[in-house]
Amino acid sequence: MNFLMLYSNQWVTGNKPIGLASLSAILKQSGHQFTLFDCTEYSIIAENAKENDRKTELGSKQMMHNSNALEFKYAENHERLPVPKPVTHKDLIDEFLRTIDRIKPDMIGFSGLTDDYPLGLGLMRHAHSSFPSIPTIAGGIHPTV
């Protein structure tokens, strides 16, 4: 089977989806395909933002989560880290739907923390609307509790 999993991390933090990593390993060991659509690679910006606003908004988000959240040690040589791609909410939806169309999964799942749940649920609703024959499943702390 071909699985697509959504990690709806919208805060550009270094949280690692341990559950998805474990699931990926088990599925791959059993001969299945596993693709991860990781929202950490994107920074959602306002629909009407200009290019300079996009850079400022992205920079503010990175600074907030790299230093103020105190979750992670400040990275030396942070300029070497990948910069999340600034996208509008609609762009992110379109990218997710294109990924589904491209890999043609047999099942789509998502995992995320409570803060990420609205984004993940929204993307999954778009997936279900556009591809109603593909089963969907949710996991992680928020859907479980």
Where are these regions (language model features)?
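Generic signal for short, ordered secondary-structure residues
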Residues: 5-6, 78-79, 106
